[in-house]
Amino acid sequence: MKRITILGSTGSIGTNSLEVISRFPEQFCATYLSAGSNVKLLAEQAKRFRPKGVVIMNESLEGELRSLLAGESIEIMSGEEGLCEISRRSDTDFVIGSVVGFAGLKPTVEALKAGKDVGLANKETLVVGGEIITSLVEEHGCKMLPVDSEHSAIFQCLVGEAPEFVGKIILTASGGPFRTWEKSRFEQITVADALNHPNWKMGSKITIDSATMMNKGLEVIEAKWLFNLDYDRIDVVVHPQSIVHSMVEFKDGSVKAQLGVPDMKIPIQYALTYPERFYADYERLDWRNISKLDFETPDTEKFRCLALAYEAGRKGGSYPAVLNAANEVAVELFLKEKISFLNISELIDDAMQAHDGRAASSIDDLIDIDAQTRRYVYDKADAMHAV
């Protein structure tokens, strides 16, 4: 029985993870669950899956959670310390990191320090702290298994292959809802437009990231750390059908690709069962209904966030942390309709240009840079409105 902690159990990855766990009650159990502020769903999950403990990140909601779980023999914690505590406890074997954004960094660090294997869906953790995280994986002998569909695809294509035979990896991107829009129309993009993803059902932050193609940019940086490749060996192609999840090109010119219906339960299950594969009755590809698979070069003039991510990755150091913090704030402001869609990339670019490039050798350094960048972007956005 593999005992599983889910950091972010009420989000898209978390709810899909619980669905996978429910299909294999003899193999998996949910030991600890956490949520940001969705206290009602967390309580429902706790009553259904009977974990040992739950964490609500929003400390002001702890009282409500206690009321909802009154009479239940479930430990209740709150805040970042609660999240870190369930990440390192000895009575869990595997941690699924699906907390959105920078908030996922510290609990992932705690899980790795405690020698836990991690299924990583929180790409920001590697974007911000790639060098620190990969060092911890090596130091503590942990496995870090990708849960993102694209990185899971690359991981699967690399099974049985020697690293020296890899030429490059090719991450596929749906292109989002604005793939066919002219740049001149981008000024008119509304929040509702941007949340209307053509292929995947995801949380609001990652859906906006997909619309700007920042999601793919973050995945490029994540791939650099997961697969130890330079940026000139990480390509992105737009694939509107989201059937080919990613590819690996080898030195002899041959290419391996991993295909499947766009269903996050499949890569989640693979991370949980690796190196085995369990039967599951998920939807299968119907080859009779696939008339063609399209591939395009991404337009980085329209989608500047992808180019900014490559720039931050190549500069290295603390630039990816700045990229991530600026993006998180810009997306938050866009979702609140305080800035326009085009302002997202503008604010990220401004923050990167303003950054002094100082090194970040510890988690505390990264926290300081993250906080400074967030203040800068909030101030810059306020100045936009003042004009």
Curated annotation (Swiss-Prot):
Keywords: Isoprene biosynthesis, Manganese, Metal-binding, NADP, Oxidoreductase. One of its GO terms (biological process) is isopentenyl diphosphate biosynthetic process, methylerythritol 4-phosphate pathway involved in terpenoid biosynthetic process. 1-deoxy-D-xylulose 5-phosphate binds at K123, S149, E150, S174, H197, S210, N215, K216, E219. Gene3D superfamilies: 1.10.1740.10, NAD(P)-binding Rossmann-like Domain. Its EC number is 1.1.1.267. Mn(2+) binds at D148, E150, E219. Its cofactor is Mg(2+); Mn(2+). NADPH binds at T10, G11, S12, I13, G36, N38, N122, E124, G203. Pathway: Isoprenoid biosynthesis; isopentenyl diphosphate biosynthesis via DXP pathway; isopentenyl diphosphate from 1-deoxy-D-xylulose 5-phosphate: step 1/6. The keyword Oxidoreductase applies. GO terms for molecular function: 1-deoxy-D-xylulose-5-phosphate reductoisomerase activity; manganese ion binding; NADPH binding. It catalyses: 2-C-methyl-D-erythritol 4-phosphate + NADP(+) = 1-deoxy-D-xylulose 5-phosphate + NADPH + H(+). HAMAP family: DXP_reductoisom. Belongs to the DXR family. Catalyzes the NADPH-dependent rearrangement and reduction of 1-deoxy-D-xylulose-5-phosphate (DXP) to 2-C-methyl-D-erythritol 4-phosphate (MEP). This is 1-deoxy-D-xylulose 5-phosphate reductoisomerase. It comes from Chloroherpeton thalassium (strain ATCC 35110 / GB-78). The gene is dxr.
